[in-house]
Amino acid sequence: MKKQNLIDMEGVVTESLPNAMFRVCLDNGCEVLTHISGKIRRNYIRILPGDRVKVELTPYDLTKGRITYRLRAKSSNS
């Protein structure tokens, strides 16, 4: 169940840190320290630097967030 007061944003993973932490540069230019959500961890989804991701932020601390979705890379075949 999704919480009401979360802020959803998109960004690019710039750095992979220990303990499943990542540094993400959001589309508005802010750098955020994030961790991965339980569903991504449970399904063994790999997050690598350069991936586009969706991030949830709380209005209380805009410097930390949670990666909720890894966006698919656009294929160059079409």
From Swiss-Prot:
Entry keyword Plastid: yes
Compartments where found: Plastid, Chloroplast
Coiled coil: none
GO MF entry, a single one: rRNA binding
GO CC annotations, alphabetized: chloroplast; cytosol
Keywords: Chloroplast, Initiation factor, Plastid, Protein biosynthesis, RNA-binding, rRNA-binding
Domain S1-like: 1-72
Gene3D superfamilies membership: Nucleic acid-binding proteins
Domain of life, per lineage: Eukaryota
SUPFAM superfamilies: Nucleic acid-binding proteins
CDD domains: S1_IF1 (cd04451)
Function: One of the essential components for the initiation of protein synthesis. Stabilizes the binding of IF-2 and IF-3 on the 30S subunit to which N-formylmethionyl-tRNA(fMet) subsequently binds. Helps modulate mRNA selection, yielding the 30S pre-initiation complex (PIC). Upon addition of the 50S ribosomal subunit IF-1, IF-2 and IF-3 are released leaving the mature 70S translation initiation complex.
PANTHER family xref list: TRANSLATION INITIATION FACTOR IF-1, CHLOROPLASTIC
Quaternary structure note: Component of the 30S ribosomal translation pre-initiation complex which assembles on the 30S ribosome in the order IF-2 and IF-3, IF-1 and N-formylmethionyl-tRNA(fMet); mRNA recruitment can occur at any time during PIC assembly.
Record-stated family: Belongs to the IF-1 family.
Protein name: Translation initiation factor IF-1, chloroplastic
Annotated source species: Physcomitrium patens
Phylogenetic placement of the source organism: Eukaryota, Viridiplantae, Streptophyta, Embryophyta, Bryophyta
